Amino acid sequence: MLVKVYGAAVQGIDATIVTIEVNSSRGIKFFLVGLPDSAVKESHERIISALRVNGYKFPTSQIVINMAPADIRKEGSSYDLPLAIGILAAAKIVSEEKLSRYLIIGELSLDGSLQPIKGALSIAISAREQGFEGFILPRQNAREAAVVNHLNVYGVANIKEVIEFFNVERELKPTIVNTREEFYKNQENFPYDFADVKGQESVKRALEVAAAGGHNLIMIGAPGSGKSMMAKRLPGILPPLSLGESLETTKIHSVAGKLGKDSSLIATRPFRSPHHTISQVAMVGGGANPQPGEISLAHHGVLFLDELPEFNRSVLEVLRQPLEDRHISISRAKYSLDYPASFMLVASMNPCPCGYYNHPTKACVCNPGQVQRYLNRISGPLLDRIDIQIEIVPVPFEKISEKQQAESSASIRERVICARKMQEKRFANHPGVYCNAQMESRLLHLYAEPDEQGLNLLRNAMTRLNLSARAYDRILKVARTIADLDHSEQVTSIHLAEAISYRNLDRESWAG
């Protein structure tokens, strides 16, 4: 007897429906075809054990299973449940009447309980697009999948529940999530606030400019000057995620298996801070079974690289293309995957090996050559892609001991949102451009052309600091953002002067 059940394969951050054909005939062999990996092939033993523990017998007839389309590799153990249901249906133990209306996914334990899977949200979206009535999956993933409207999502704990459901011996209750309520309820959930930071007004201003224009930023300062503390507060002043951005961000984290138990939508911008020992694959994604890397997990959020020179140079160099293209392509011999990677890069570093170069009170013990070698760990092309380079000096005791509370993140965020709205209006007719940091040269000439006084200032700065053409564009982008914060349509010399001041690593005084 031939029956069909439906599962799904995750490719990149999207899912493809997999048709599982099960044919039962005379004989005793078990065949599984359709490009399954070793984990899928091992499902035979898990299914036998799960059925036996729950009082069902594995059929003694010959079982042939085909997983189509055959050109897509089927990876992981999430096919256990649909394979088991298909085998039982072919043996007439499970009714096949409702099988075509449901997409089924889940990993089986030996006792028949279901383990969580990766990519539940992507699979749910694909199930709705293909017109399935319902989606049956492990209970731990039910809330994540239930954010998809117009699809009945059933979270189950054991294979027995699924068997009894198809045999009309049990009713399954759909998991219901009010997507918009869930999303907006968690949007203001920020653990850190700029109100807790004393002093550092110039750094706060630089972070505000970075947030307003989506600019990459690096902070240079001595140990303990507050670089990490400031970076952690950046997501709290960024504009809130839109529902579409939230859905895309959640899909990436779902595919990577980074969503917590019973999670639904990610409502706040991601903040990723990998250790400096991270590998290239972990940073950009890939591997034997390709997974999103840190740059994709930071999509629509912040990627914070603390102690930037300590990262392997090859790891830093692979960031160059994603910083420009805002996505990363992972190529293999037979296929290519594309992961989104539109993130704000925020980095921090000491100014020298000892950490006290240019320190107001402590003496630096490094010679100019050591300082230069330390700075040279970061390549010029990577630094060119960082719009804002700001120096942090330690906060004096008088500032730390002040009783007056600093400006809150909420106040700064209001100004940032206002500037972003100006940019949305400006780029309404330019698809794919949402903030000033994404402007290319053509748009810079349209929207960031300085006045005559500003042009002279910029010309002198370019000559004196020996800046590249890319750095020239970066200065104009930052100046455009500063003008937006100032509610100005024209980029003036005042805006350019502030933008030029954010090129600290280009100054002649560095390293000597």
Regions found by a protein language model. Give the residues of each.
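Peripheral, non-AAA+ core regions of ATP-driven protein-machinery
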Residues: 1-218, 222-225, 331, 471-472, ...
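Basic, amphipathic alpha-helical bundle interface domains used for macromolecular binding and assembly
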Residues: 39-44, 59, 66-76, 289-290, ...
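Residues immediately C-terminal
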Residues: 110, 303-304, 310-311
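Conserved inter-motif catalytic segment of the P-loop NTP-binding fold
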Residues: 245-279, 286-287, 434-442, 469, ...
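Short loop/turn elements that form and flank the Walker-type P-loop nucleotide-binding site
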Residues: 26, 58-61, 98-99, 131, ...
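Conserved alpha-helical scaffold flanking the Walker A/P-loop in AAA+ ATPase domains
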Residues: 208, 265, 270, 281-303, ...
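Walker B catalytic acidic pair
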Residues: 300, 306-307, 318
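Walker A/P-loop
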Residues: 219-260
